Amino acid sequence: MLEQSRSTQRRIVMPPSDEKQLTSDIIALATKYGRYGYRRITALLNNEYGWSVNHKRVERIWRNEGLKVPKKQPKRSRLWLNDGSCIRLRPEYKDHVWSYDFMIDRTTNGRVFKILTIIDEYTRECLGLVVQRRITSQEVIDKLFELFILRGIPEHIRSDNGPEFTAKAIRRWLARLGVKTLFIEPGSPWENGYVEFFNGKMREELLNREVFTTLGEAKVLIEQWRREYNQVRPHSARGYRPPAPETILSLVTT
């Protein structure tokens, strides 16, 4: 027998036949969702694009294509009851604890607008938003009333000590409905960690990336992002499933 170098006998490893399409889909999703890491992209590929791929393969392609993995956010402090007790009020089921908060942004003419965000702490779903130049306590009540009709009444609602939330009108109205109010310590936004996390994602993924020329445009884009957050965006705390999978919308158009 003729001697032959072992190096010439090595099997040439060819990339899978679907590698090109998978790479294309990963790049498309990474472009659309600039703050998502490869694990969330993997979840989107499997949930929405019909792939059955593990995160290690996606990570390999991710790094080969020079895509940047976003830095992890620091862990937030624990949430405590505002009576100073050492028992953390954890949401244990849907509608157990809601929380709400305000955000501020501007249109291109420099005028400020406010965003009221309301979430279910257990499901992580954003239940509703209000986007206006100015939001009064009565408008907060009106939005909560709308959500109570549609979703039912929560047992608790958590907020900071902003005047819109501590106003007598809203506190009395909630008390009449049997909703217990939880107020965080002043200057301690981490105690309202669930809604602060949501607000941070909206800031990163939308507000810091968009320019709003009018209030109407801001309303449309913010509501569009809310629906995508609820119905499409994989959430790590929910096993990389969206907060409201029962209303999931397909990303793939036919």
Where is each model-derived feature located?
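Generic alpha-helical secondary structure signal
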Residues: M1-Q4, A169, R176, G193, ...
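Active-site beta-loop-alpha junctions of metal-dependent nucleic acid enzymes
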Residues: R111, L129-R151, P163
